[in-house]
């Protein structure tokens, strides 16, 4: 379900969806834990601002942009439709990425995955530690704002690591199905870790929800 949900969310964000009839309105998802639940690794102030301000802004701007798009679509205004594409990508990607991100985290997270996901990580990266090192390095190395991702290549049946700039969604950008995302925008860590992104990356491994990542992996293999 998680894989299908991610894919269907991406389709709903497409400009043609809902052109006829009532238009789907996106909403801010509730967190599955309290704002302070991830402390001391990610503090409550960051979580509150990140969720209730930043993610909410992506949702609101996405709805507003889609409204303008559908008005332009109804008028046959192709120029406006094209002009709105960057805003659809940015705000739609922000909504997709953060919706995955919140479920990728848990106050009971950390440690290592189990079962077939762990075996796949060992197969594709050599060991769990090598995987952590690579995803950490890719995430730390993002220039400016963006995301580090563990994704599933459906065609090859293998796990891959990738980085996306700004709010570019992983699947729409690379074709990889998102399993685990690490937000490296400064708003995700600056209030606690200042400009030391590597310290934030070191801390976030303590709250990774491997059960959620495993569910996504299992669903996407079907």
UniProtKB/Swiss-Prot annotation:
Positions of modified residues (3'-nitrotyrosine): 58
GO CC terms: mitochondrial inner membrane; mitochondrial nucleoid; mitochondrion; myelin sheath
PTM (free text): Nitrated under oxidative stress. Nitration coupled with oxidation inhibits the catalytic activity. Acetylation at Lys-122 decreases enzymatic activity. Deacetylated by SIRT3 upon exposure to ionizing radiations or after long fasting.
Gene3D superfamilies xrefs: Fe,Mn superoxide dismutase (SOD) domain (1.10.287.990), Iron/manganese superoxide dismutase, C-terminal domain (3.55.40.20)
Keyword Cell cycle attached: no
UniProt transit peptide range: 1-24
Pfam families xref list: Sod_Fe_C (PF02777), Sod_Fe_N (PF00081)
Obligatory cofactor(s): Mn(2+)
Keyword vocabulary terms for this entry: Acetylation, Manganese, Metal-binding, Mitochondrion, Nitration, Oxidoreductase, Transit peptide, Ubl conjugation
Record EC number: 1.15.1.1
Binding site for Mn(2+): 50, 98, 183, 187
Enzyme class: oxidoreductase
UniProt-listed GO biological process terms: acetylcholine-mediated vasodilation involved in regulation of systemic arterial blood pressure; apoptotic mitochondrial changes; cellular response to ethanol; cellular response to oxidative stress; detection of oxygen; erythrophore differentiation; glutathione metabolic process; heart development
Residues that bear N6-acetyllysine: 68, 75, 114, 122, 130, 202
Compartments, record wording: Mitochondrion matrix
Gene induction: Expression is regulated by KRIT1.
Note on how the cofactor is bound: Binds 1 Mn(2+) ion per subunit.
GO MF, one example: identical protein binding
Reaction equation(s) it catalyzes: 2 superoxide + 2 H(+) = H2O2 + O2
Positions where N6-succinyllysine occurs in the chain: 68, 75, 122, 130
Subunit-structure text: Homotetramer.
Family: Belongs to the iron/manganese superoxide dismutase family.
Primary role: Destroys superoxide anion radicals which are normally produced within the cells and which are toxic to biological systems.
PANTHER family membership: SUPEROXIDE DISMUTASE 2, SUPEROXIDE DISMUTASE [MN], MITOCHONDRIAL
Identification of the protein by name: Superoxide dismutase [Mn], mitochondrial
